[in-house]
């Protein structure tokens, strides 16, 4: 019987374990209880990226149906989770970012969103170019003195970090060989994701907090490393932008603050208000339901999952959003 390696993340820490691929959900939950001390009846299991809650109703479900080798699951105790979805903070290390690239013909809005708060500045969404390197441009904005162009050099930086530590960044973690990943990430057509944010957090020695608009959750990379600073990004399902505190209303980027103490609760609160505003305005894409078309063969697909399966079976990797008229 085949084995799969997964990573379990909870308040108690992170642990790598190997499981039989045909293990049942109820057996997985018993193992989780043993490892995390969170009772099976109060467990919330988050998987995928962005993490989504696993349906626990079918206790006989086989784990290979929703977990793959190298996956990370995040375990929360539902009895201690705040009822305010904007307050939740979870971390996900899922190391396979999107292994298939989707051509960015989906345009982000060319404006700055700002949270209305005068005291101490305004939480502000700074837009990055709508291309396959938006994650890197957003990171460069908040960590490289607001220079988005430096984002293009971050791919090579990530490859150097991965290449220098083949033990940590092995095939089980990356979903491909160390060398193969290093070549893949330097292709400007490929998207960045969770593993890239984790590597960049480690390189810059700061927490990188990414808000997912659709869930209003914050995924904080590097929070277990005791860094003293944090930066913020915003993710709408297909695109990353940078977040800042602008000292004046509708002010220029020169007035932006992008680095914050991890103890700065006021700035965090402002960011959450902005995320809620973006959510209510519907400024996100449901990647599970939106329609795509493969530009290689003109096949229409529903959601990112179907596109990923199509790419893996055909080798096609050029997708764009498809809207029926």
Curated annotation (Swiss-Prot):
Enzyme's top EC category: hydrolase
Reaction(s) this enzyme catalyzes, per UniProt: Thiol-dependent hydrolysis of ester, thioester, amide, peptide and isopeptide bonds formed by the C-terminal Gly of ubiquitin (a 76-residue protein attached to proteins as an intracellular targeting signal)
Domain OTU positions: 123-246
Gene Ontology molecular-function annotations: cysteine-type deubiquitinase activity; zinc ion binding
UniProt-listed InterPro entries: OTU1_Ubl, OTU_dom, Papain-like_cys_pep_sf, Ubiquitin-like_domsf
EC code(s) of this entry: 3.4.19.12
The species this protein was found in: Dictyostelium discoideum (Social amoeba)
Gene Ontology CC: one annotated term: cytoplasm
Protein's GO biological process: endoplasmic reticulum unfolded protein response; ERAD pathway; protein deubiquitination; sorocarp development
Zinc finger boundaries on the chain: C2H2-type: 292-316
UBX-like: annotated span: 7-86
Region annotated Variable-loop, chain positions: 185-195
Record's protein name: Ubiquitin thioesterase OTU1
Residue ranges, annotated region (Cys-loop): 128-134
Start and end residues of each stretch annotated as S2 site: 265-270
Highest taxon above the source species: Eukaryota
Annotated positions binding substrate: 238
CDD domains recorded: OTU_plant_OTU1_2-like, Ubl_OTU1
């Amino acid at each position: 019987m085949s084995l799969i390696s997964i990573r379990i993340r909870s308040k108690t820490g992170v642990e790598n374990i190997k499981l039989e691929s045909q293990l049942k959900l109820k057996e997985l939950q018993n193992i989780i209880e043993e490892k995390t001390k969170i009772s099976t009846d109060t467990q919330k299991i988050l998987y995928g990226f962005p993490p989504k809650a696993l349906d626990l109703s079918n206790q006989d479900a086989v784990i290979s149906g929703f977990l793959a080798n190298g996956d990370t699951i995040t375990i929360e105790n539902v009895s201690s989770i705040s009822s305010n979805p904007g307050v939740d903070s979870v971390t996900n290390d899922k190391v396979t970012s999107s292994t298939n690239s989707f051509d960015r013909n989906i345009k982000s809005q060319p404006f700055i969103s700002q949270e209305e708060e005068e005291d101490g500045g305004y939480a502000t969404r700074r837009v990055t170019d709508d291309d396959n390197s938006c994650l890197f441009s957003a990171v460069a904005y908040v960590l490289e003195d607001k220079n988005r162009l430096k984002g293009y050099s971050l791919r090579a930086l990530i490859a150097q970090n991965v290449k220098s530590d083949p033990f940590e960044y092995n095939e089980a973690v990356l979903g491909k060989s160390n060398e193969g990943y290093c070549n893949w990430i330097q292709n400007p057509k490929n998207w960045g994701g969770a593993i890239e944010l984790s590597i960049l957090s480690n390189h810059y020695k700061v927490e990188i907090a990414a808000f997912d608009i659709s869930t209003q959750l914050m995924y904080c990379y590097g929070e277990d490393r005791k860094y003293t600073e944090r930066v913020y990004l915003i993710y709408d399902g297909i695109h990353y932008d940078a977040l800042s505190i602008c000292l004046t209303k509708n002010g220029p980027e020169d007035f932006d603050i992008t680095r914050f103490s991890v103890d700065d609760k006021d700035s965090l609160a402002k960011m959450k208000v902005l995320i809620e505003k973006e959510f209510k305005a519907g400024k996100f894409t449901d990647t599970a339901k939106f329609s795509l078309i493969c530009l290689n063969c003109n096949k229409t697909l529903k959601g990112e999952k179907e596109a990923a399966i199509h790419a893996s079976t055909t080798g096609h990797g050029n997708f764009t959003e498809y809207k029926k008229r």
